[in-house]
Amino acid sequence: MNNLIICDTREKGNKKILEYFDKVGQDYIVSKLESGDYMIYKDYTTIIDKKDTLLELAGNLCNTLEHKRINREIDRAKELGCTNFIFLIQDNKIKSSEDIKNWHSSYMPNLKGEVLLKIMNTMKERYSVRFMIVSKKDMGKTIIDLLMKK
């Protein structure tokens, strides 16, 4: 079984994740990916797209140009054979759908959490993607577990 993780060169803020990979002996390379931020080398089954905050995800899903880019990225992943596209949202405060529903941001005051949750649910239905909230300290382990299907 192939255990080499590829991390996209455009993925920012991944220093702690790569340090975790080093700590646990997880092999990885940094290389440009066609879709997402993390995957197993030559295995497109599972692709992970990491978001640093729920606000980043909201911006991606609610901005028309960004939303179209995300849709193209998911379509590209599926063309490559991806059957498990996962958005990993790094957030220490959000724990549940109810927390997303009650979410608000001063940066996007017109977007209510309830609307964001509906958009996420529509994406789940339309594109068969998953959304997972993960704490910053657990991000590296979660990426390995999802890609290695532990």
Where does each model-flagged region fall?
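Non-catalytic C-terminal interaction segments of nucleic acid-processing enzymes
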Residues: M1-D43, L57-K150
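Conserved catalytic cores of phosphodiester-cleaving nucleases, focusing on short active-site segments
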Residues: T46-T53
